[in-house]
Amino acid sequence: MLLAIGVIVWCWGLLSRRPMLRRQGKQKGRCCVLFSDLEVFLLRPPTPSASPPAFTPMNELNAEGNATSSATESHSLANGHYQPVTGEEALDTRGPDDWTHSVVDPPRTLDCCSSSEDCSKEKLDERLSLNSCTDSGVRTPLCRICFQGPEQGELLSPCRCSGSVRCTHEPCLIKWISERGSWSCELCYYKYQVIAISTKNPLQWQAISLTVIEKVQIAAAVLGSLFLIASISWLVWSSLSPSAKWQRQDLLFQICYAMYGFMDLVCIALIVHEGPSVFRIFNRWQAVNQQWKVLNYDKVKDNEDHQKTGATFRTLSLPLTHRMGQSGPEGEPSTSTSSLMAAAAAAAAGTVTPTTNSVPPAAGATTEPQDSSEPSNGQPSLPDHHCAYNILHLLSHLRQQEPRGQTSNSNRELVMRVTTV
């Protein structure tokens, strides 16, 4: 009995000693790892500061790491117990020669890649500069719409714009007009001089892109026009036809007449409101489905048109000026006329509330009216101030002219308020 109990206790002691040994071995291994890490951290050779560490190929690093790890594992197994090897220990096992050999020059592949990218950018810049500049160093004209040169087609200058926005290709301009729906330049507001050559074949007509609002505008204009035509035709027939005599006498039809008249007014207002938008859409469609010839900007013709419009304005304002200048029987301006002319001159100078005294002319002094078409002393002529001039002219006609006898006896003061627009 005692022998059996002793055997059991001895077996129990053996079984309990093995976990203790294992725990002691684990603790000992951890302490060794900690001390080895501290040794590597404190005693490892410093990295050279002359050149930055290079990126060695991954296959070489893996081979060296595997070799060092296998060597350390075999050494630990030879000592009788297994000790895990960390990466820092593997690095510590490498000698100083290995550290010096690991620091190599940077790979040339990165330099080649960066240099090739720089070369490609430089070549692209050179191509752009060659495309934009001629051999003489003068910048070649480019289309302001597609930014291409003369190799894409003939460049035109269709408006008053100058500089980099002067030239454009004819197809690009026609396409831009079809998108905007306007035949005028958006920068200088000059109307392009175009000639319609011919309309394309109906089989070649192209549809233009429309927004939802534009579709609604077209539908409203078309339906309003149809309703207006139908209602007006019915009203004309019912009011003039002898067979509709009984309709004109019926109260219900008279109410319908009033309703149709009101709806006709609404349709007319709708057509007037949506008409310009529909007209612009039609211009866009016409620009796409018709062949055009765009003309270059002619400065001489443009100046002639400006001169014609200026001459027309001056001819319209000349009779009014002569009426203001010649009011007396002997060509002498009256007091009201002279005061009005002085007020107009003050308004032209920027005076808001001019005050003039009508002084009678001295004996023997004569005044000659100046022609408004010729400016005096480099100042703009009187008809050019159209707003103030028209107001003063109306006031001069509304005011009664004074007799010549009364103007010599007393002086009257005329105060006028002129607002410049």
From Swiss-Prot:
Its main location: Golgi. SUPFAM superfamilies: RING/U-box. It is found in: Golgi apparatus membrane. GO terms for molecular function: ubiquitin-protein transferase activity; zinc ion binding. Zn(2+) 1 binds at residues 143, 146, 169, 172. GO terms for cellular component: Golgi membrane; Golgi stack; trans-Golgi network. Pathway: Protein modification; protein ubiquitination. CDD domains: RING_CH-C4HC3_MARCH4. It catalyses: S-ubiquitinyl-[E2 ubiquitin-conjugating enzyme]-L-cysteine + [acceptor protein]-L-lysine = [E2 ubiquitin-conjugating enzyme]-L-cysteine + N(6)-ubiquitinyl-[acceptor protein]-L-lysine. It is a multi-pass membrane protein. Residues 1-16 form the signal peptide. It comes from the Eukaryota. Its EC number is 2.3.2.27. The chain crosses the membrane at residues 218-238, 252-272. Residues 65-77, 367-380, 403-412 have a biased composition (Polar residues). Keywords: Golgi apparatus, Membrane, Metal-binding, Signal, Transferase, Transmembrane, Transmembrane helix, Ubl conjugation pathway, Zinc, Zinc-finger. The RING-CH-type zinc finger domain is required for E3 ligase activity. This is E3 ubiquitin-protein ligase MARCHF4.
